[in-house]
Amino acid sequence: MDRFECWDAVEKRLNSLTSPESLSGLVFVEKVFEELGDPSRFPAIHIAGTNGKGSTAACLDSMLRAAGYKTALYTSPHLTCLGERLLIDGQMLGGEKWLDALERISVVLKKLPEVRLGYFQALTAAAFWLIEREKVDAAVIETGLGGRLDATNMLRRPLLSVITPLGMDHMHLLGNSLSEIA
């Protein structure tokens, strides 16, 4: 299978595991993480905000790598390939590793038939499972939509939380004021 076929297979597998965005908050994500052995215990820097999350995350990842740390960088969205969302020491993991992670998620979902995950929830569970196995010194994790129900809030050991400038985006989901959004 060539590179493009592999990433197409990863995307198809991910889509086969997801439902329309789950309204369960983190309840289903917590169940999946519990079955996975809680793959969210790695040391992390958690980044939220409206503007500048990706740039801030990339800069922090670069500084950590320059200082000799093994890093993971998890961002969204991707431009051309899902693998862009997770870099280990600045490099994409192979599609085969993502397929392994998604197979593990599939096994868990078969054990928990009541659980439905949205796309970002399943992707985050797979990414955290991969990060845990890569034994990084630090992970830089960018929120998705953000807010209290974001799947990246499953992090157990944030070393630092960073909030970049906030705007009034996604008010229907996150709140009607900057303090509610934050």
Give a label for each model feature:
Residues S19, I141-E142, I163:
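Redox-cofactor binding/interface segments in oxidoreductases and associated redox assembly factors
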Residues L160-G167:
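Conserved beta-strand/loop subsegment of P-loop NTPase cores
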Residues L26, E30-S40, A66-R156, M168-A182:
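ATP-dependent carboxylate-amine ligase catalytic core
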Residues N51-K53, H78-L79:
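Short active-site-proximal "capping" loops at secondary-structure junctions
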Residues M1-G49, T56-A58, S62-A67, Y74, ...:
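Short functional linear segments
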Residues H46, L87, V162:
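Conserved beta-strand segments that form the floor/walls of ligand-binding pockets within enzyme
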Residues N51, G167-M168:
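Short histidine/acidic/glycine/proline-rich micro-motifs that form metal-
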